[in-house]
UniProtKB/Swiss-Prot annotation:
Domain Myosin motor: 105-780
Annotated function: Myosins are actin-based motor molecules with ATPase activity. Unconventional myosins serve in intracellular movements. Their highly divergent tails are presumed to bind to membranous compartments, which would be moved relative to actin filaments. Plays a role in proper daughter cell budding and separation.
PROSITE patterns: MYOSIN_MOTOR
Keyword ATP-binding: yes
Record's keyword terms, sorted: Actin-binding, ATP-binding, Cytoplasm, Motor protein, Myosin, Nucleotide-binding
Single GO BP term: microtubule-based process
SMART domains attached to this UniProt entry: MYSc (SM00242)
Protein's name in the database: Myosin-B/C
Classification of source organism: Eukaryota, Sar, Alveolata, Apicomplexa, Conoidasida
Keyword Cytoplasm appears in the UniProt entry: yes
Residues holding ATP: G199, E200, S201, G202, A203, G204, K205, T206
Alphabetized InterPro entries for the sequence: DLC_sf, Kinesin_motor_dom_sf, Myosin_head_motor_dom-like, MYSc_Myo14, P-loop_NTPase
A GO CC annotation given for this chain: dynein complex
Family named by the database record: Belongs to the TRAFAC class myosin-kinesin ATPase superfamily. Myosin family.
C-alpha cells in the first residue's frame, strides 16, 4: 500500500519499494469488525484521507470514529478532531489505530503506547508540545522539541533536582536526565560514554549541547574549575566562528563537533578535547538571500573600538563584497546583539589565553580575508589568451592592504593569483591565468584560510584543556546534522548523510544490544530477534573498491573526468548493488541513493570541483612565508606536491578518514541519543506543522527506532498492565485475587493463541505483533456482545442520575418558582406598546423608552391578587429571551458615566428611612428562612438598608461596580476591615456551593435596568481576617498534602482561565490544582471540601505577610452575563467542563442555555488603606 501522505514525503515522490514506505505499508492494526462481520461503531482511528487534511495538509492526520454502515471493504467515518459534519468512506487499509483513554502528558515513553503508528506518535508529541512538555522518550532516544521560548526548565534549580534525585528513573525525560545517566554509567561501569545530539538546523542541537555541558559543570564550588571554565568559555568562540544566520535558524551551527570530556560528579569537567569537521567554508565568500556569513565578522565590525577600526583597516558592513550576498547583505538578526556578543568573545579569548599578539593576528586575518574579497579581477587579451586575468590599480591597493594584514608578500601573492607556472622537464614555463581561474584561486584562498583559522582556534583550546596523561574514561558529545534533504543535494549532503548512515548502523547495534539484555534479564529466548542493519549500504558508499567514495576519488585524480562521466560511472558500476538508482528527472547528471530513511536524489554538477577544493601549493607557500606566527602556523604540517593532487588530499578522502576515526571512538562507548525536532519554520512558540515534524521523524530515525522495537516480541507489558489492557477477555478472572502473573498466563492460554507467539518473563509478558492483534480482535468481540445490554442499561442509568439531580435541586426550583410568581405579578410593570413591540420583534429599541413603573406597596406581605403559572412563565421566557438576547445586551450599559457618590450616600444613610420597620422585618425574616447568613442581626439590617437605598434608581453595569465599592467601604468603616462583595445577576448563584472562611451573608435583591427590564441579582458579603502564624503552618502542611496527590498530571488543557490577576506561574499552578481536585470531587459534588482544599493550598503557599485570607467560591454553572467585582490585588476565575452535568443534560437544551460547567473563583482579601 502506498499511502497518499507519503507520496511527497521529504519533498519528492516515493518509489513503491522505498525503505520509508514500510512504516506505512505495515498491516493496519485497526480491527473494527468481529468474526461475524459486524462493525464496532464508535471505534476511534486516524486517517489522512479526510476533509480536514485535504483543507490543511499540515495536519497530516485527523481523528475519526467508525459509524454505522461500515463494511469490511470500506469504513464509514465521522471526523471528530478537528470536528466536522457529515460522514465519508475510507478503505480499511487507509486508517490507523488511535490510542484511547491515554493522557499524553503521562506518556513519557512513546514506545509503550498501545499503538505506535506514525499518527499516534505525531498526536502524542503534539499534545505534549502544546502543554510545554518538550521532552519525550522513545528508548533509547530522547526526543526534544524546540519550544522557541524559555520554559524555565534549565535553571540551576532544575539541574539540582536532576543531580540530587534519589530515584532519577522516576523523573520525567530531560537532557539533564540523559546527562546524569551517562555520568552514572561512566562512574559505575568505568566505561566510556557518548551522547549523540542530532537534528536539522534550528532544532535546538546547540542549546541541548550547552545544557549538557552546564549539567556536567555544575560541580561543587570548592573545587578548582580553571579547565572547566576554559571549556565553557570556548563555546562563545566556537559559536562566533562556526555559527551563522540561515533562513531556518538565526544561530545555526555550520560545523560538526565531537567533544571528549573527562567528567566527575564531584569535580565537574576536568579535561577535554574537541574535534571539528565539515565546516561550511563556502559561507565565508557567499550567502543566500536573508542569510549571513559567520557571526564573528559582524561582531568585529559592530563591536570594534575606533582604535581597533583604524588598526585593522575596518570598513562598514556594506563595503565588503563577501558580506553582501546575491540580494544584498543581511546585517541584523532579531534576538542577536552583535556588540554584546563581541564583548563576550573578548572575554572568552582571555579565558583561552589568546591575548596580545595572538589576538592581534586573529583580528588581522579576519580583516584581511574581508579585504581580499574586494579585490576585483578583470579580463583582457594578453599572450594569446582572450580572457587573461589582471587586477586594476585600485584593486591592487586593496590587495596590498590585505596582504599587509595577513603579513604576506603582496607581489608574490599577486603573481600566484595571476600567473600559471608549468614545469616541462628542467624548465618552468609561465603563462597567464584566465579570469575565472584567478577568481577561483582568490575564493579558495579565502575559504581555506578561514577554515585553517577555525582549526587553529580549536587547537588552542585543546592545548589548554587536554589531559597531560590522557583521559582514562570520557564522555563524548557529538553535535551533528541529521539526514539532510534539500531541493538540490550535492557533495556536502552526501558527506552529512554518509555520517548519519554510520551513526544509524551504530544505533541499530545499540538497540539490538539493549533488546538482547532485556530478553536475557527476563529469561526470554533471543532467537526471535532478527535485525537487518545497513552494513551493505555503508559498504556501497565507503568501501575500498567499487564504492561511491572510491569512484569519486578516481574521477578527481583522472585527467579528463567530467561530472557527466562520473554520474554514468556511478550508475554503471554501483546500480547492481541495489542502493543506487537512475534519476527520473535527469539521468545525465543526477542519481539516487537509497538511504535508510528515504531515497535521496543528488546532482553530480560541480561535485568533482568541490571535492578538489584545496589551496594550490604555490599559494600555500606564500602563506607559510608570512611573518606573522599565527598566519604561518595555519598551514604547518600540510605538504602538497606542486601541480598534482595526491590521494588523501581530497575533501571526501580527508573527511572519510576523520569520520572513521570518530566512529571508531564512538563505537567503543556506551551511546545515548538525543533527537532534536523543529516544530515549525516560523520559529513561533506553540506553532506546530505536522508535515514538517513527520519529515524529521523519518530523517532522525525516530520511527525507525520504534520499528526496531517491533521486532521479535514487540508487545511487552508488566503483568498488571497486561491484565488491565485485556481485562474484557475474562473479567471475572481479572477481578479475582489471584496473582497477576498467573492471571496473565491464563488469559493467554484461554485465548487459543499458539504458545510460540508469547512468553511469560520474570516481570513482563512478551507477545509477538500478530498475536497481540489477535488478542485485540478477541477482546473487541467480547465487548460487542455487551451492546444489547448497554442499550437497555444506558437509559435506566440516565434515569437514576436524573432523579438524583432533581432531588438535589428541588429546593432551588421551589425558590425559583416563588421568585417567578413574584416577578410575573400582573400590572407590576407597564411598558409602552412601542417598546413591547420592539422587544418582541427583535428590532432596535427607542433610545428613551417610555417606562412607567408603578410604586410597589409593601403591606404585611399581602399575597398577590393573581399569580401566573410556572409553565406559562417558562413558556413566555423561552419565547422572548432568545429573540431579545442580542437587543437586550445593548441596554446593559446605557449610562456608563453614572456613578455613586460615597459621601452623599453616607449622608443619606444617616437619615431614617421611611421603610425602617419593613427593612428590619425583612432582615429578620431572611435570617429565619435558613438563608446562608452568619452575620448578626445588626449587620444584616445594615446590609439591607444599604441595598435598599442604593437600588432606588434604575441601574447600569457601571453603577453595579460602584455599588460594590460603596457597600464595601461602608461595612469596612462600621464593622472592621476585610469585607468582600460579589454581585452576580444570574439566578444560578442561588445554586452555588460556597466556602468562605469567615462571616457570610447572601442578599437577594430586585433591580431594574434603565430600559425598564427587571432582574434578580445576588450579593454576597463576608468578613474575614488575616490568618494567624499557627494557622499558616497548618495550611502549609495541608497544602503539601493536597498538592502531593498527583504531581505528574497536567490539567492546563481542561481548566479554562477566564480572568486572572496573578502571575503566570501561579495561574498554571493553581489551575493544575483545581483540575486535579475536580477529578476527585466531580462525582460526589462535595464542593465545600473541594473549596476547602483549594483554600488551604492557597493560604499555605501564596499568602503574603500583608495579605489577607484567600477565599474560594465554587458554583455549578457559568457566571453568565455577570459582573463579578471584588476589591483585591490577586484574583483567578476558571471554568471546568462538567461531564456529569453534560451527561444528565437534555439532548435538546433550551436556546441560550450555557454549557454545563463548574466555575471556581479564588481571590485574596487585602486590607484597604484607611481613609
Amino acid at each position: 500500500m502506498e499511502r497518499k501522505q507519503t507520496q511527497m514525503i521529504l519533498g519528492r515522490r516515493l518509489a513503491k519499494d522505498s525503505p520509508e514506505v514500510k512504516h506505512f505499508q505495515r498491516k493496519s492494526s485497526v480491527v473494527p469488525f468481529g468474526r461475524d462481520g459486524r462493525a464496532a461503531t464508535n471505534f476511534t482511528c486516524w486517517t489522512a484521507d479526510c476533509p480536514a487534511v485535504k483543507a490543511d495538509p499540515t495536519l497530516v492526520f485527523a481523528k475519526c470514529i467508525v459509524v454505522g454502515g461500515s463494511m469490511d471493504t470500506q469504513l464509514e467515518l465521522e471526523q471528530v478532531d478537528p470536528p466536522a459534519r457529515g460522514t465519508f468512506t475510507v478503505a480499511p487499509t487507509d486508517v490507523f489505530n488511535a490510542n484511547e483513554l491515554i493522557e499524553p502528558e503521562t506518556v513519557d515513553d512513546i514506545g509503550y503506547l498501545p499503538h505506535t503508528n506514525v499518527a499516534c506518535v505525531l498526536d502524542v508529541l503534539k499534545s505534549r508540545f502544546l502543554r510545554s512538555i518538550i521532552y519525550t522518550t522513545a528508548e533509547p532516544l530522547l526526543v526534544a522539541i524546540n519550544p522557541f521560548k524559555d520554559l524555565g526548565n534549565t535553571t540551576d534549580a532544575w539541574i539540582s533536582t536532576y543531580r540530587n534525585a534519589s530515584k532519577p528513573e522516576m523523573l520525567p525525560p530531560h537532557v539533564f536526565k540523559t546527562a546524569r545517566a551517562a555520568l552514572e554509567d561512566l562512574e559505575g561501569y568505568k566505561k566510556n560514554q557518548s551522547i549523540i545530539v542530532s537534528g536539522e538546523s534550528g532544532a535546538g542541537k546547540t542549546e541541548a549541547t550547552k545544557q549538557i555541558m552546564r549539567f556536567f559543570a555544575s560541580a561543587s564550588s570548592e573545587v578548582r574549575t580553571t579547565i572547566q571554565d576554559t571549556i565553557m568559555a570556548g563555546n562563545p568562540i566556537l559559536e562566533a566562528f562556526g555559527n551563522a544566520k540561515t533562513i531556518r535558524n538565526n544561530n545555526s551551527s555550520r560545523f560538526g563537533r565531537f567533544m571528549m570530556l573527562d567528567v566527575s560528579s564531584h569535580r565537574g569537567i576536568q579535561h577535554g578535547s574537541i574535534s571539528n569537521f565539515l565546516l561550511e567554508k563556502v559561507r565565508v565568500v557567499s550567502q543566500e538571500a536573508n542569510e549571513r556569513s559567520y557571526h564573528i565578522f559582524y561582531q568585529l565590525l559592530k563591536g570594534a573600538t575606533s582604535e581597533m577600526r583604524a588598526k585593522y583597516h575596518l570598513r562598514s558592513l556594506k563595503e565588503y563584497a563577501y558580506l553582501n550576498g546575491k540580494n544584498g547583505g543581511c546585517y541584523d538578526v532579531p534576538g542577536i546583539d552583535d556588540k554584546a556578543d563581541f564583548e563576550e568573545v573578548l572575554q572568552s579569548l582571555d579565558a583561552m589565553q589568546i591575548t596580545g599578539s595572538k589576538r592581534h593576528s586573529v583580528f588581522s586575518i579576519l580583516s584581511g580575508l574581508l579585504l581580499i574579497g574586494n579585490v576585483s579581477i578583470e579580463g583582457k587579451d594578453a599572450q594569446g589568451v582572450p580572457d587573461a586575468a589582471y587586477i586594476s590599480p585600485q584593486s591592487e591597493e586593496i590587495l596590498e592592504e590585505a596582504c599587509q594584514l595577513l603579513s604576506v608578500d603582496d607581489a608574490a601573492l599577486k603573481k600566484e593569483i595571476l600567473v600559471k607556472s608549468t614545469k616541462v622537464g628542467p624548465q618552468v614555463i609561465e603563462g597567464v591565468r584566465t579570469k575565472d581561474e584567478a577568481k577561483t584561486s582568490v575564493l579558495s584562498l579565502s575559504k581555506n584560510v578561514y577554515d585553517k583559522l577555525f582549526d587553529w582556534l580549536v587547537r588552542q583550546l585543546n592545548s589548554l584543556i587536554d589531559a597531560p596523561d590522557g583521559m582514562p574514561n570520557f564522555i563524548g558529545i557529538l553535535d551533528i546534522f541529521g539526514f539532510e534533504v534539500l531541493e538540490v543535494n550535492s557533495l556536502e549532503q552526501v558527506l552529512i548523510n554518509i555520517t548519519n548512515e554510520y551513526l544509524q548502523k551504530h544505533f541499530i547495534d545499540v538497540v539490538f544490544d539493549m533488546e538482547t539484555k532485556l530478553y536475557q534479564a527476563e529469561g526470554v529466548p533471543t532467537e526471535a530477534l532478527e535485525y537487518t542493519d545497513n552494513l551493505a549500504l555503508v559498504g556501497a558508499l565507503c568501501g575500498k573498491n567499487d564504492s561511491f567514495f572510491a569512484l569519486l576519488e578516481d574521477a578527481c585524480l583522472g585527467i579528463r573526468s567530467t561530472d557527466e562521466g562520473f554520474c554514468g560511472t556511478i550508475l554503471r558500476r554501483l546500480e547492481p548493488s541495489g542502493f543506487f538508482l537512475e534519476s527520473r528527472r535527469d539521468k545525465r547528471l543526477k542519481f539516487i541513493i537509497r538511504h535508510t530513511i528515504a531515497d535521496i536524489e543528488y546532482t553530480c554538477e560541480g561535485m568533482l570541483e568541490k571535492n578538489k577544493d584545496f589551496l594550490r601549493k604555490e599559494v600555500m607557500d606564500v602563506m607559510k612565508a608570512s611573518t606573522d606566527p599565527v598566519t604561518k602556523a595555519l598551514f604547518e604540517g600540510i605538504e602538497i606536491e606542486a601541480g598534482k593532487i595526491g590521494k588523501g588530499t581530497l575533501i571526501a578522502s580527508r573527511f572519510l578518514k576523520n569520520l572513521e576515526e570518530m566512529i571508531g571512538i564512538v563505537a567503543q562507548t556506551e551511546a545515548h541519543f538525543i533527537r532534536c525536532l523543529k516544530p515549525n519554520e516560523e520559529k513561533k512558540p506553540l506553532g506546530w506543522n505536522g508535515s514538517k515534524v513527520l519529515n524529521q521523524l523519518f530523517s532522525l530515525s525516530i520511527l525507525e527506532a520504534l520499528q526496531l522495537r517491533q521486532v521479535g516480541y514487540a508487545y511487552r507489558r508488566n503483568f498488571s498492565e497486561f491484565c488491565s489492557h485485556f481485562r474484557w477477555l475474562d473479567l471475572g478472572l481479572v477481578n479475582s485475587d489471584r496473582d497477576r502473573k498467573e492471571v496473565a498466563q491464563l488469559l493467554l492460554e484461554q485465548s487459543g493463541i499458539p504458545e510460540s507467539s508469547w512468553v511469560i518473563g520474570k516481570t513482563m509478558v512478551f507477545v509477538k505483533p500478530d498475536a497481540a492483534k489477535e488478542l485485540s480482535i478477541l477482546q473487541r468481540e467480547k465487548l460487542m456482545c455487551f451492546q444489547p445490554l448497554i442499550a437497555v442499561l444506558g437509559p435506566m442509568w440516565r434515569k437514576v442520575l436524573l432523579r438524583k439531580k432533581m432531588a438535589r435541586v428541588i429546593h432551588f426550583l421551589t425558590r425559583l418558582e416563588s421568585n417567578a410568581r413574584r416577578h410575573l405579578e400582573p400590572d407590576s410593570i407597564n411598558i409602552s406598546p412601542e417598546e413591547r413591540e420592539a422587544l418582541l420583534s427583535g428590532m432596535e429599541r427607542p433610545r428613551n423608552p417610555c417606562v412607567v413603573v408603578k410604586k410597589r406597596v409593601e403591606p404585611e406581605r399581602a399575597p398577590p391578587t393573581k399569580v401566573l403559572s410556572l409553565s406559562r412563565a417558562r413558556l413566555s421566557l423561552s419565547k422572548e429571551l432568545p429573540r431579545n438576547y442580542a437587543a437586550s445586551n445593548e441596554a446593559l450599559d446605557v449610562d456608563d458615566t453614572m456613578s455613586v457618590d460615597t459621601d452623599a450616600f453616607l449622608r443619606l444613610k444617616m437619615k431614617r428611612s421611611p421603610n425602617e420597620n419593613y427593612l428590619r422585618q425583612t432582615a429578620l425574616a431572611r435570617l429565619k428562612e435558613r438563608r446562608p447568613s452568619h452575620v448578626c442581626m445588626e449587620e444584616a439590617y445594615h446590609v439591607w438598608r444599604s441595598v435598599e437605598l442604593l437600588f432606588r434608581e434604575p441601574l447600569s453595569d457601571k453603577r453595579l461596580q460602584n455599588i460594590c465599592t460603596v457597600i464595601r467601604n461602608d461595612m469596612d468603616q462600621h464593622y472592621g476591615f476585610f469585607w468582600q462583595v460579589i454581585i452576580n445577576r444570574t439566578p444560578n448563584f442561588g445554586m452555588a456551593a460556597t466556602h468562605i472562611h469567615g462571616s457570610l451573608h447572601v442578599v437577594e435583591q430586585e433591580g431594574m435596568y434603565r430600559d425598564g427590564r427587571q432582574f434578580l441579582f445576588h450579593l454576597i458579603m463576608y468578613k474575614t481576617r488575616k490568618p494567624r502564624k499557627e494557622e499558616i503552618r497548618l495550611h502549609e502542611r495541608a497544602a503539601e498534602k493536597t498538592y502531593g496527590i498527583c504531581r505528574k498530571r497536567d490539567f492546563s488543557g481542561i481548566v479554562r482561565v477566564m480572568n486572572s490577576k496573578v502571575p503566570p506561574y501561579m495561574q498554571k499552578d493553581v489551575s493544575y490544582l483545581i483540575g486535579m481536585l475536580f477529578q476527585r470531587y466531580q462525582y460526589t459534588r462535595d464542593w465545600t471540601n473541594f473549596a476547602t482544599c483549594i483554600q488551604s493550598y492557597l493560604i499555605g503557599r501564596y499568602s503574603e505577610p500583608f495579605g489577607g485570607a484567600w477565599n474560594v467560591v465554587a458554583q455549578e454553572g457559568a457566571f453568565f452575563l455577570s459582573r463579578l467585582w471584588t476589591k483585591h490585588s490577586r484574583f483567578l476565575r476558571v471554568e471546568i467542563d462538567f461531564p456529569a452535568l453534560a451527561e444528565q443534560a437534555s439532548s435538546e437544551p433550551c436556546p441560550g442555555c450555557p454549557t454545563p460547567v463548574l466555575t471556581v473563583v479564588c481571590f485574596e482579601a487585602c486590607a484597604p488603606d484607611r481613609p
